[in-house]
Amino acid sequence: MEINVKIKPNMRIQAFYLFFIIVSMQIGVGILGVPRLVFSEAKQDSWISILVAAAYVIIVLLAMLLILKQYDNADIHGIHRDIFGKWLGKIFSTVYILYFAIAFYSVLLTYIEVVKVFVFPDVSNFVMGLLLISLTIYGVLGGLRVIIGVSFVFGVLANWILFLLIHPALQIDFNHYLPLFQAPFVDLLKGARATSYTFMGFEILFLVYPFIQNKNKVRISSLLAVTWSSLLVLSATMLAIGFFSAEQLERREWAVLVLFKTQSFPFVERFDYIVVAELMMVVVPSLLFLMWGLTYSMKRVYKVKQKLTLYVAAIIFLIGTFFFEKHFETQRVINFAEQFGFWFIYVYPFVLLPLVLLKKRLKKRKGAGSS
Amino acid sequence: MRKRMKRSSKNVFPLKIDELEQLMKSEFDKSPDLSFSKYEHQNKKIAVFFIPYQVQPDRVENLLLTPLLESKEEWSNTAILNKIPLNSGKEYQQMDEILPGLIAGKVMIYIEDEAAVVSYDFLNKEKRSLEGAETESVVIGPKIAFTESLVTNLNVIRWNIRTPDLAIEEITIGKRAPREVRLIYLKSLANDTDVDTMRQRLNELDVDNVEDSNVLMQYIEDDSASIFPQFHTTELPDRTSYAILKGKIAVLMENSPSALIAPSTFFSFFESTEDLYMRWNSGSPLRFIRFMSMFISVVLTPMYVAAVTFHYEIIPTQLLISIGQSRAGVPFPPVFEALFLELMIELLREAGARLPTKVGQTIGIVGGVVVGTAAVQAGITSNILIIFITISALASFTAPSYQMGTSIRLLRFPMIVLAGILGLIGIMFGLCMLIIHLLKMTSLGRPYLSPIYPIRFEDLNKALYRLPQNFQYKRFISLSLKDSIRFSKRNAKEKKDIDE
């Protein structure tokens, strides 16, 4: 396995799309439930928590970019190979692959759960799983260009649902935000920790970085993406806190979805149904990228054909949907994904960064000594 | 067969006139159409042979036979070619050149003991005259349509694009029954890779015959499994030359009244030349209406089915009451009701397309008005659904390309079934599948959904809407043409201050 990836010229993508890649990975079903999670820790000071979390995400992102900059055109698997050697590197990469699998599974189950709660209480997991997984297979078979296209087109198309939030936004009670600065520092951090599942997804940068043509635009594009998703999460949380009273909010698992119920037109009511359907457009790009990450990583690390991984993983996930029918089971998967992702996405780059810098310095010294 | 081919590729000349007659008779043994006449002139035997209905008899008489027989001098091949200076004079030596030549309306002259046959082209091809477009009718702008004659069509195109820059390449397609195909593009504009791809696809086509350019399209398109057409076929010369001038490639085929335009994008199928002739601020909304109606046509009936079957909560109470009253007597689930009505509309359309125009109109009235009213009164369908079905059928007919309109109309059926099974989730699944499919498609190797993905902001003003002409100083960037500037931006109007 080479450390640096050679990309065919027709597979290169513009950094412009990185914005949509990262936003579509970050904004998924997580945003629907995040207000309650943050609120139960930080109460009306949730906005501080989210700002703290966003700042932390940006720091992690900058660290990731710094790591990637040390190489010509490497992805995370190449870096693992370079830093940890053949076998240890493979183990770390395998953990990454496992992360993609678990994240895929948690997104899949969460969307099925939302559909069950809001639209079809009796729909079987298998049918919904079949729909989503067949979309995933069909999309991933198109390759990275198509997946990025999906994230871009769906990312633009799904934005109309934001306009439906204008109506609830006009009915906010500003007293819900007061008094300011009440939460102790620990609670604020706990609140920030609660957003970790929602903000996950920017780690895809570690994989798509070699594909990007204009590397000088990567930083601005990814920073804008993270800022935009942070803004969305922040406004969703603020809306939910302003609209619902404290005990209402704590009892509503998907508070943001409930907000859509208030909007109505002479010909359509109950927009939550439509929004849940529209959410498929938000969820599918995440699923596609996670599945692509899984198959591409398998190809990079173990030289398995992507098609083989795709079909096998799809069948396993489809069978897997049978075993997590209940709410608490789904919740367990999400919690596990969150735990796993937290250490892997938010902490691990800071372990990798000094190692990469050290290795580079050693190499430089060696090069200087030999010449 | 193989034996005969071998023999005819051999040079049989020189030979006696009687031997030639025997040979020709044996070649044409199953079709007694060959006219083989022998003359004696200045002690030399001359044979003239041709297929009478493939040539223009009076021209043959006046231009060829009269000078041939009335002359006093002795004829030889060179003498004939010199004395009868029609530009199509040629010498042939091989049988497999002579036989297709006879079929293509050539008159052959053989002088005994010469080494070759002299031929002149007198092709008489029956054709209809240029008429107005039938399937792609336009309100303003040129109205003539292509005919079945390639020469006429080329004439029209040449007259539209009067520049030597226009390349018209000749390619022959089909093994058993060959047809001429022309590849037309602007040398200084069209992308070389695209032209090469197209030429290669046409040259490598290994089929025994191709019926029409619509069939040709199916042979050479990128993804034959897709429901969407990947090349545009049009019967408007106007539209074809517009596409050529934009840097695209056109393919014309003998005996086919439609041209093929490549590469095409999804959005170009909703583009009518009328948009250009209208002013930009009335052309853009018209195009927008077409996009809207495409969406409506795919989604409206499925939405109704989904709402009435599963999610009646999304219908406001006032509306729900009227829908409920209208549906009260209907014994079928909404899916069947919708499928039944959609099928009826398709029947009407199909019957209307097959029948003569006058009868077709009657059928439309009988089918639409009488059966529709009767179906509602009999309690089989609801009024409101009929309204939705009619709107979506109308919407599907707004697509300027008939092929695209048909694809969209057919897409409704799986969407209705999906809506009937899984409601809004099913519709969304269908839409997602559709968009992913469109993203995967290519036309001549170029993305089908361009310029949306990959996004080219400069192209949006031509593909999705139109701006005034002085904003359109660039050609489509996504086509990567040799010259993408239409005119200098400086020539566009300068800004002025208020006039005092």
Where do the protein language model's features map onto the residues?
Chain B
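Membrane-embedded alpha-helical signal segments
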Residues: 1-299, 314-317, 438-500
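Functional cleft and adjacent loop/helix regions within the main domain
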Residues: 311
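Generic detector of multi-pass transmembrane helix bundles and their immediately adjacent loops
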Residues: 303-306, 316-319, 331-500
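Membrane-interfacial loop-to-transmembrane-helix junctions in polytopic alpha-helical membrane proteins
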Residues: 278, 282-285, 326, 352, ...
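Short aromatic-rich membrane-water interface segments that cap or initiate transmembrane helices
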Residues: 283, 321-333
